[in-house]
């Protein structure tokens, strides 16, 4: 039997505990061998120290904020032990079969996976099952090394990264029955969203500055906790049941 790939779920975060605990829960429910996966969380919001004791979860709390998302990405990936890097954003959600979906779609010549069958969730409901672009991509650590690591950019860096990996070949657009979809791309009412912001330019503060200002405004209003924070993994909603019902209703309509 072929050995399953070691998958490092890479999560970078800044002041979004309410959604981070959903991402954490999503990792903990994975139906995947515990010795073949890990979750790496990098937190560079100095006003928070995130705490969660689990053998598969490692949290790095930093005293200074990275000036570039690309630097933060590289810091996180350098600390990943897996052959595969699964983007595990702090505001998205995965079903329990997600890591197994990665393993099933990854071939010897694969460099990157995109989810052609993904779940687009626009608060408060699932909107569609469709391709989700660069959300939840999975790439090999080897490919990351071969392209010179993550680009030292802010907004738009994910597009630069994927374009460089695509140039290597080995691109998989993973399709599966709707009932097997496992990655939720979450939108609507879930905080400051980098996606859709385009690339940074001199006409406005960069994405790091804008997000920091947004989190600070929430902290002042008492909506962002500070200090030592013991993470309690949980979903806000039964997303698995929501997906099941969505697929069932879609089938009955068709």
What does each of the following model-derived ranges do?
Residues 63-80:
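Glycine-rich, basic loop-to-helix element that forms the pyrophosphate-binding segment
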Residues 22-36:
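Short, acidic, metal-binding catalytic loop of nucleotide-sugar glycosyltransferases
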Residues 85:
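Short aromatic/hydrophobic "clamp" motif used to bind/position activated sugar donors
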Residues 92-105:
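Acidic donor-binding/catalytic loop of UDP-sugar-dependent glycosyltransferases
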Residues 154-161:
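Acidic donor-binding loop at a coil-to-helix junction in glycosyltransferase catalytic cores
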Residues 5-8, 38, 160:
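Cell-envelope/extracellular polymer assembly enzymes that use nucleotide-activated donors
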Residues 113-127:
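Short beta-strand-to-loop element that shapes/binds the nucleotide-sugar donor at the catalytic cleft/hinge
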Residues 1-26:
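N-proximal low-complexity "stem/linker" segments adjacent to membrane-targeting elements
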């Amino acid at each position: 039997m072929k050995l399953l790939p070691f998958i490092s779920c890479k999560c970078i975060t800044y002041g979004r505990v309410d959604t981070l605990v959903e991402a954490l829960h999503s990792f903990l429910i994975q139906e995947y061998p515990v010795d073949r996966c890990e979750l790496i969380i990098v937190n560079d919001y100095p006003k928070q120290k995130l705490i969660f004791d689990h053998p598969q979860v490692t949290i790095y709390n930093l005293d200074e904020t990275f000036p570039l998302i690309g630097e933060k990405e590289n810091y996180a990936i350098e600390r990943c032990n897996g052959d595969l890097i699964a983007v595990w954003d702090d505001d998205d959600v995965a079903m329990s079969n997600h890591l197994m979906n990665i393993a099933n779609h990854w071939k010897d010549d694969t460099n990157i996976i995109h989810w052609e069958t993904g779940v687009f969730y626009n608060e408060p409901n699932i909107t569609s099952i469709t391709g989700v672009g660069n959300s939840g991509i999975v790439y090999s650590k080897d490919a990351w090394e071969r392209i010179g690591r993550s680009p030292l950019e802010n907004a738009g860096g994910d597009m630069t990264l994927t374009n460089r990996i695509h140039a290597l070949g080995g691109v998989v657009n993973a399709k599966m029955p709707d009932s097997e979809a496992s990655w939720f791309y979450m939108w609507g009412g879930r905080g400051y969203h980098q996606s859709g912001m385009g690339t940074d330019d001199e006409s406005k503060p960069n994405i790091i500055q804008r997000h920091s200002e947004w989190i600070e405004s929430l902290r002042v209003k008492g909506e962002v906790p500070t200090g030592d924070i013991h993470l309690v993994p949980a979903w806000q909603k039964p997303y698995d049941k929501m997906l099941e019902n969505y697929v069932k209703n879609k089938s009955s309509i068709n």
